[in-house]
Amino acid sequence: MSIKSDRWIRHMAKQHGMIAPFEPGQIKQNTTGQRIVSYGTSSYGYDVRCSHEFKIFTNINSTIVDPKQFDNGSFIDVESDVCIIPPNSFALARTIEYFRIPRNVLVICLGKSTYARCGIIVNVTPLEPEWEGHVTLEFSNTTPLPARIYANEGVAQMLFLQADPDDVCETSYRDRNGKYQGQTGVTLPRT
């Protein structure tokens, strides 16, 4: 597998709809000229933005977190340009971008250093071959202080790995009828 460059990412987004909406360059300021956490195409990746939809963990119901029997009441829904994650807590969000991953590509997501240096960690499982949807983002605030996430700004970087022509997967995410195929919005655990 080889990592793909900005040229390849632009081509796949424009010609094959791999990322929508798509920013071909790197945006570092908003429309009023204020600095923001960057998003868009980088040398060997794509920095995604967070939408304004958030789900913040709460303990008001004192339930046990169980991925097989997940209680939707464990979250508070927030729509805002900013999400405040409580100390040592967790929030879900989604990307603005919708992805359509080719059969011969695997995408790995890494957090942005701007957030990591503040103790905010983003986790996303790999985007598998032929998966499509909005990416659900998992944010952990590892600090003893409240932490802020900004909507409509960069939050994570996607790295695109392309298989050699003789090594394309036999079974894709679509072939397996993956449970998160076509997800839109912030998607909670499914079994």
UniProtKB/Swiss-Prot annotation:
Question: What SUPFAM superfamilies does UniProt report for this protein, alphabetically?
Answer: dUTPase-like
What residues bind dCTP, as annotated?
112-117, 136-138, 157, 173, 183
Pathway as given in its UniProt record: Pyrimidine metabolism; dUMP biosynthesis; dUMP from dCTP (dUTP route): step 1/2
Q: Name one GO molecular function term.
A: nucleotide binding
According to its UniProt record, this protein's enzyme class is hydrolase
Q: What is its EC number?
A: 3.5.4.13
Record field: catalytic activity: dCTP + H2O + H(+) = dUTP + NH4(+)
Keyword terms, alphabetized: Hydrolase, Nucleotide metabolism, Nucleotide-binding
* Active site as annotated: 138
Annotated GO biological process: dUMP biosynthetic process; dUTP biosynthetic process; nucleobase-containing small molecule interconversion
- Domain of life, per lineage: Bacteria
Name which cysteines form disulfide bonds.
Answer: none
| The keyword Transcription is annotated on this UniProt entry | no
Q: Which PANTHER family match?
A: DCTP DEAMINASE (PTHR42680:SF3)
Entry similarity comment: Belongs to the dCTP deaminase family.
Quaternary structure, per UniProt, is: Homotrimer.
Function in brief:
Catalyzes the deamination of dCTP to dUTP.
Protein name in the entry: dCTP deaminase
- Its source organism is Xylella fastidiosa (strain Temecula1 / ATCC 700964)
Protein's gene: dcd
